[in-house]
Amino acid sequence: MTVLLSSINGFAKIKPTNEVAQNASQLTTIFDNYFSIKDALISSDAGTAATNAKSMAIAIKAVDMGKLSTEEHNVWMKVAKDLGGSAEAISKSKDVSKQREAFNLLSKNMYELAKASKQAVPVYYQYCPMFNNGKGANWLSKESAIKNPYYGNKMLTCGSVTETIK
């Protein structure tokens, strides 16, 4: 926020800058793409997951790091390459099981980004203990109810909320 002082009336006026809005929209697009991929994997829809992942890969390349907060920028520098690689892997695969494997790494990096960025609504970090040969896997959701993207209808409600990010 920028504080502007008016010499006319002596009152301070607080005016939000466009940079804050641009920053939010950059990351909002990436989060929206992520949630769309998750929803497609819940439905075991490899085609829609691939399409949404392609959109996400484009949005990742378009991020202007100079408009991110310091914390977001630091996290972005660590996760951007893997985010792009995971999104590309999902977009190029027609096999939902391979997409789910790539989604696991995508989710780890999106978690780091979610922790660093300010979300307009709570985001739930959820966990499935069964995926990855019993090693487990996490994902982000806008809903607290479990809808497992790693198994879809086979084990739709397998998992739990491990953290709420506000």
Identify what each model region corresponds to.
Residues M1-P16:
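Bacterial Sec-dependent N-terminal signal peptides
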Residues E19-K166:
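Mature extracytoplasmic or organellar-lumen-exposed domains after removal of signal/transit peptides
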